[in-house]
Amino acid sequence: MIVDYHMHLRDPDERVVHSLEAVERFVVAAAERGVDEIGFSEHVYYFRQTRRVWALDYQTERCVYDLDAYVEVVLEAKRQGMPVKLALEVDYVGEQQDELAALLAPYPWDYLLGSVHWIDGLAVDQQPGLWARASVDEVWRRYFAAVVELASSGHVDVLAHPDLAKIFRMRPDHIEYPALDGVALEISTAGLRKPVGELYPAAAMLEAGPPITLASDAHVPADVGRDFDRAVVHARAAGYETVSVFEGRKARQEPLG
């Protein structure tokens, strides 16, 4: 089975649009690329219901969409038999993580992605961001500390782009990858389209054998399932024969491929 569990509903011009027509475009693209099931995982800070947990202008400027409408669109697609799952990409927000989890708890998610883009209000995947305030070693240390905190919170099911800190090809001389229990890791092809030019995560993060999903981080239908041949090779090289399939925040294992 091939799943793509990380994508964002957009129109052909990459504008946010939470509509059944947009869902259908992504579903058609998935079928054309041999992807059996897709999951929509919009950024949590796009929804006004979560407004009170955000502090950065980047987040609050985008916090204008209706979470209930987004959920209903994906649920309607499911009712119509489309092979889609309902999810969100849940950002690390430190002390506000419990509050954010409580806001999201009433909704019927199939899974929740966890990601770390900001630490103490400074971006990891944008420059200058945290890179202007801390050494490379310190950025990585703080990044993985946040990843571990998010993974151990019980609030997310899958970690998105788990070693995002490598995005600009700046790495410590020695990287200590943390033990991450209780969550799956996505093998993401998005890194191939970033300055690092690599899949997320590094093979070393898969050595302990955590459950995996596959992800494109598509913002347009053309990127659904993109470079998944390389993602599958990466997974098999690490010893994987199955992929996690989620429903109602419960995972089962299905044969990979």
Give the ranges of each region predicted by the language model:
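Short, acidic/polar
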Residues: 18-29, 95-103, 141-150
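Structural preference for beta-strand elements that scaffold enzyme active sites
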Residues: 1-4, 37-39, 83-87, 110-113, ...
